[in-house]
Amino acid sequence: NFMQHIMTVMSSHGRAGVVLPDNVLFEAGSAGEGIRRRLLEQFDFHTLLRLPTGIFYKPGVKANVLFFEKRPPRADGKPNTKALWIYDFRTNLHFTLKKNPLDTKDLQDFVACYQVGLLGQRRETERFKRFEIDELLKRDKLNLDIFWLKDESLDDVDSLPTPDFIAAEIVENLQAALEAFQAVADELAVKP
């Protein structure tokens, strides 16, 4: 699979940031659990960014960015990951491709929390939490689909979008997808 390939071809001390669907974090079976275990033990899997829905053409896609570095095995045999920092950029945030697109400014808090080059100086915030390796390894099937923020939209039925708003969002997503596909079709038509 894609993730296994990346992990295999990375050079020692190489770094990666990989966008993957949610199921990689909790997929049952030996393959899914094995990938997560290898990621935690052989790599310094230091950061997980939970992406909001509405930023991809396919509506409802739940994805994450995994940030990790390949390390040589530790002399003490312990995992290379000491702690995983998770930034929840999904709960109570909503983006669309046209009316409310994701912008660079929306990621400023994550960038500030990430502390490029200064991982040891990170501080927890409401959206950014640290999970120790011992805690992660005890989780059933190494499930890394971790969340702590309460989704307010699930409690407040009155705050749910109206049917016409939902319909308008569907139309917007379909139009954006159609435009993207039309651009591909136009490009293919030009080539001999």
Where are the regions a protein language model picked out?
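A conserved structural/catalytic subdomain of Rossmann-like adenosyl-cofactor enzymes
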Residues: 1-192
